[in-house]
A protein has these predicted regions:
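Secretory targeting and sorting signals
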Residues: 1-21
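Active-site catalytic motif of lipid deacylating hydrolases and related acyltransferases
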Residues: 24-36, 47-122, 295-303, 307-314, ...
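Extracellular/periplasmic catalytic domains that process cell-envelope and extracellular macromolecules
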Residues: 51-55, 82-83, 117-119, 144-148, ...
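Active-site-proximal beta-strand/loop segments in catalytic clefts of secreted hydrolases
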Residues: 62-65, 86, 91-96, 126-130, ...
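Serine-dependent carboxylesterase/thioesterase catalytic core
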Residues: 63, 105-198, 214
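Surface-exposed patches in mature extracellular/periplasmic domains of secreted proteins
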Residues: 92-95, 121-125, 273-282
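Polybasic, low-complexity, intrinsically disordered segments
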Residues: 117, 334-435
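C-terminal catalytic-base region of ester-bond hydrolases, centering on the histidine
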Residues: 200-338
Length: 435
């Protein structure tokens, strides 16, 4: 949401109000090129039969933090949509979504574009938890995707952050990157909701539970999941507004609750968002949504919980930096993160075949906890750890551009690029310092 600040300036006896410029990119600025390699983006999307030249809007399923699309949706939404003849695709994020949600946004952008191109029509999006806010990130910073989306249905989405994340990261530092970004005071949340929360031409249905133990506050229409303004058609509805006795919690509202599924189907079957009055009482007498097998439910739900609790990512002592493309001052089309970016350097002489060893440096008192290495645009290494000091990269191409991205324990992100010239004879190994 755009904030207008009136500043009182007394100069020559004149009271002059001024409007502070927003630090975030305007909503109509074209999005940057995707930084994630195309091969990884393609591999992240799994689709049902019928997606090509679809007869009706296909649904993009976006999972919550800690699980893949298969782990969350294979036992509920996937079979339920298939039973209704609705094609779908599920997108999965690196590290099960525990890492930087800005990167996850690129996966959703690719999924939207791919599904729109294959189906030949506008798509719908259903997301649970993080899966509710990351699609909004894609729509906010890649404007071309807005014309490709008809409906956005979110379940327990922390659209304005969660005080649970505030408390968790405040008590048990360090936290995973996505946890820091889910705090109500995070830069990610501020950027997500900058200028406007919705966009014209898209229908938004946000479903939440008052008994959600993870995403709060969520007691009424002013809670974190609810959206307001911006031009999109919006329905914000608590599960308990439809079924007062439904006490579903965070996982359930997005994976097996009948009210949430009924809201999704209502939004898909009608113009505009879901209308709670059309849902009737049928969801209130059902124990599970369609697609859930009551016999295997205990095992299916337990497997999802196990996957969620066992998923891990690096941990930081604070929120990582925002991507440059989110800021008003960034050059249009730039996708780099705000942080230290070293200029491109060229290794002197030539390097013989073998392994390049890179020494990773950071500020005194800090340490590198994550590193990614790209060779000619293709990611060849992704490593996390408590203290990373060196990495090794195979140098097979005669000439290569190597880009190294590190993230420190304190959330500082650095990027350096080095061009390496190969030769038939020469040093089989070289040491290149990463500034």
């Amino acid at each position: 949401m755009r904030r207008l600040l009136l500043t009182t300036i007394l100069a020559l006896g004149i009271l002059a109000p001024t409007v502070a410029a927003s630090p975030f990119a305007p909503v109509d600025r074209p999005g940057p090129a995707l930084d994630v390699p195309a091969q990884q983006l393609a591999a992240s999307l799994q689709c049902s039969p019928g997606i090509d030249h679809a007869m009706r809007a296909p649904v993009l399923l976006v999972p919550g933090t800690g699980v893949t699309a298969y782990q969350e949706f294979s036992w509920n939404y996937e079979p339920a949509l298939t039973q209704r003849g609705i094609p779908w695709c599920g997108v999965s994020f690196p590290d099960s979504g525990n890492d930087d949600m800005q990167i996850n946004g690129e996966y959703v952008v690719n999924a939207i574009r791919t599904m729109h191109a294959r189906s030949g029509r506008r798509i719908a999006i259903y997301g649970h938890s993080q899966g509710g806010e990351v699609p909004r990130w894609a729509l906010r910073f890649w404007p071309d995707t807005r014309a490709m989306v008809d409906d956005v249905v979110g379940a327990a989405g922390p659209n304005h952050g969660s005080i649970v994340a505030n408390a968790a990261c405040g008590i048990r530092k360090p936290c995973q990157p996505s946890d820091w970004q889910t705090a109500t005071t995070s830069h990610f949340i501020a950027a997500l909701n900058s200028y406007q929360e919705t966009f014209p031409g898209i229908s938004y249905t946000e479903v939440y539970s008052r008994f959600d133990e993870e995403v709060q506050p969520n007691q009424n229409d002013t809670g974190t999941s609810s959206l307001h303004g911006g031009g999109g058609q919006i329905t914000n509805v608590a599960v308990q507004d439809v079924c007062p006795n439904d006490v579903v919690e965070h996982l359930g509202v997005g994976s097996y609750d009948p009210v949430t599924f009924a809201a999704l189907v209502d939004a898909l079957d009608h113009d505009g968002p879901a209308v709670p009055a059309r849902l009737g009482l049928n969801p209130c007498i059902q124990r599970f949504m369609p697609g859930v097998n009551p016999v295997t439910f205990p095992t299916d739900a337990a497997n999802t919980v196990t996957a969620l609790e066992s998923s891990q990512s690096m941990e930081l002592n604070g929120e990582g930096p925002l991507a440059c493309y989110t800021t008003a001052s960034c050059a249009a089309g730039s996708g780099r993160l705000t942080g230290s970016v070293a200029p491109t350097s060229v290794t002197s002489g030539c390097v013989g075949p073998g392994t390049l060893r890179f020494v990773l440096h950071t500020e005194r008192g800090d340490r590198v906890v994550r590193v990614e290495v790209y060779v000619d645009g293709r990611r060849v290494l992704h490593r996390t750890g408590r203290r990373l000091s060196k990495v090794r990269v195979s140098a097979r191409a005669p000439n290569a551009t190597i880009r190294i991205v590190t993230v420190s324990r304190h959330g500082t992100r650095r990027t350096s690029t080095r061009r390496v010239k190969g030769c038939r004879k020469g040093r089989p190994k070289t040491l290149v310092e990463h500034p």
